[in-house]
């Protein structure tokens, strides 16, 4: 029979790589605990309508990239392509943002998009999401940016990432700007790239995000979104930049930053790097003050961001910021297979009393000679021998594997004290 292989665009995390994920996840939790955000765990399957109403029917994600299917009841379901919509659904369904309540939440888990697989872009990818609800002022904008900045500093990569900012204004501002942009682009229709021509009808603002040099030259003299934004929102954006200056967070303004999801309003931002080739964005977010109401909840201020975990790990690896994994155990037990009922009880007692120790043994229980060979390869500092003689005399044999010391004997009731030293 032919060998089965993994689905294209999906990845296994092998045992030798899992420590990298554990390290990153521990840093994430450390930072988010510091800001008093609470973890939530969301289903990976949602009703398709949720993403049609939030991400947008015309977005690339919904129109080209979602994994959709019908269950046995005929309901249309989707593997989540992003986390914000599901988080908003949870907040509404559980009345977490009613009567002036505020919520500061985070989640981390797999998302699914049918995209062309390449370095840093997979069809199943892990995303950290940070979301805050019920906060109107600038302070929350600064806090979510500071969370990402703190994480990058904790990981030692802050000098390799750049914060880019823009303001999308209100929905009315964007409608007025969209009409002005379409009017400007009319004479250039034949010169636009294929994707931009498609976006003219579906989502004209996404043309600003084009990476095609010819299109960017056409856009150089196009109307600017900032000129269509209300005075109050423009002032808020200016104040946000001033506060970031005071916090020492480096940033640059990017008037073409529009984001690929329809729910964003006001402030939008991305953290980018030049170390990952074309996949330069490692974190992106912004305000989405209308989404809770659009999905059936009360009018609620909201802001959040997402970090692509695989891309972040790639950046950490490329910059040499991940320590080598230490697979060595601390103690290796060498046991007599004929007396396991006694010796295994001793080992398990030590595991319970000293949970910080990494303890291993040869579960095939070969000859003592073969067990000693495995002990030498294990990286353990000591081997503890429990054979028939040791059990008869009440003493375990202690062999030091990394030091030139003579073998010792330690009474079984003193083993824990010995290993604590």
From Swiss-Prot:
Question: In its UniProt record, which GO terms are filed under biological process?
Answer: histidyl-tRNA aminoacylation
Which subcellular locations apply to this protein? Cytoplasm
**Enzyme class, spelled out:** ligase
What EC numbers are recorded for this enzyme?
A: 6.1.1.21
Q: Name the chemical reaction catalysed here.
A: tRNA(His) + L-histidine + ATP = L-histidyl-tRNA(His) + AMP + diphosphate + H(+)
Superkingdom is: Bacteria
Q: InterPro entries under this entry?
A: aa-tRNA-synth_II, aa-tRNA-synth_II/BPL/LPL, Anticodon-bd, Anticodon-bd_dom_sf, His-tRNA-ligase, HisRS-like_core, HisRS/HisZ
GO cellular component term, pick one: cytoplasm
Q: What is any Pfam family matched here?
A: HGTP_anticodon
Q: Enumerate the UniProt keywords alphabetically.
A: Aminoacyl-tRNA synthetase, ATP-binding, Cytoplasm, Ligase, Nucleotide-binding, Protein biosynthesis
Keyword Transcription present in the record's keywords: the answer is no
Q: Name one GO molecular function term.
A: ATP binding
Which NCBIfam families does the entry mention?
A: hisS
Subunit relationships: Homodimer.
Q: Which HAMAP family match?
A: His_tRNA_synth (MF_00127)
**Member of which family?**
Belongs to the class-II aminoacyl-tRNA synthetase family.
User: Under what name is this protein listed?
Assistant: Histidine--tRNA ligase
């Amino acid at each position: 029979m032919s060998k089965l292989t993994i689905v294209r665009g999906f990845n296994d995390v092998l045992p030798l790589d899992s420590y990298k994920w554990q390290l990153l996840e521990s840093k994430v939790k450390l930072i988010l605990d510091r800001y008093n955000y609470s973890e939530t765990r969301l289903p990976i399957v949602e009703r398709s309508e949720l993403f049609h109403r939030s991400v947008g029917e015309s977005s690339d994600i919904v129109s080209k990239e979602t994994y959709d299917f019908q269950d046995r009841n005929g309901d249309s379901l989707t593997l989540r392509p992003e986390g914000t919509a599901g988080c908003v659904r949870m907040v509404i369904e559980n009345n977490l943002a009613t009567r002036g309540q505020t919520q500061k939440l985070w989640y981390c888990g797999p998302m699914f998009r049918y995209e062309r697989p390449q370095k840093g872009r997979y069809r199943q990818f892990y995303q950290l999401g940070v979301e805050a609800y019920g906060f109107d002022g600038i302070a929350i904008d600064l806090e979510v940016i500071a969370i990402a900045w703190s994480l990058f500093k904790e990981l030692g990569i802050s000098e390799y990432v750049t914060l880019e900012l823009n303001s999308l204004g209100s929905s009315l501002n964007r409608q007025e700007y969209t009409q002005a942009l379409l009017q400007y682009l009319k004479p250039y229709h034949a010169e636009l790239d294929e994707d931009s021509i498609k976006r003219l009808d579906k989502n004209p603002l996404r043309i600003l995000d084009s990476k095609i040099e010819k299109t960017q030259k056409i856009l150089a003299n196009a109307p600017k979104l900032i000129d269509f934004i209300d005075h109050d929102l423009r002032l808020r954006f200016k104040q946000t930049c001033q506060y970031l200056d005071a916090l020492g967070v480096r940033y640059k303004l990017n008037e073409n930053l529009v984001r690929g999801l329809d729910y964003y309003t006001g402030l939008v931002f991305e953290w980018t790097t030049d170390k990952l080739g074309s996949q330069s964005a490692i974190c992106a977010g912004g305000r989405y003050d209308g989404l809770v109401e659009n999905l059936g909840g009360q009018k609620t201020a909201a802001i959040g961001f997402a970090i692509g975990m695989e891309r972040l790990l790639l950046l950490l690896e490329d910059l040499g910021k991940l320590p080598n994994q230490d697979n060595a155990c601390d103690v290796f037990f060498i046991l007599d297979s004929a007396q396991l009922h006694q010796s295994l009880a001793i080992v398990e007692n030590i595991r319970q009393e000293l949970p910080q120790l990494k303890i291993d043994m040869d579960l095939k229980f070969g000859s003592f000679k073969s067990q000693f060979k495995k002990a030498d390869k294990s990286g353990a500092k000591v081997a503890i021998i429990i054979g028939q003689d040791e059990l008869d005399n009440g003493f375990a044999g202690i062999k030091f594997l990394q030091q030139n010391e003579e073998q010792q004997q330690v009474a079984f009731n003193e083993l824990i004290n010995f290993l604590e030293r």
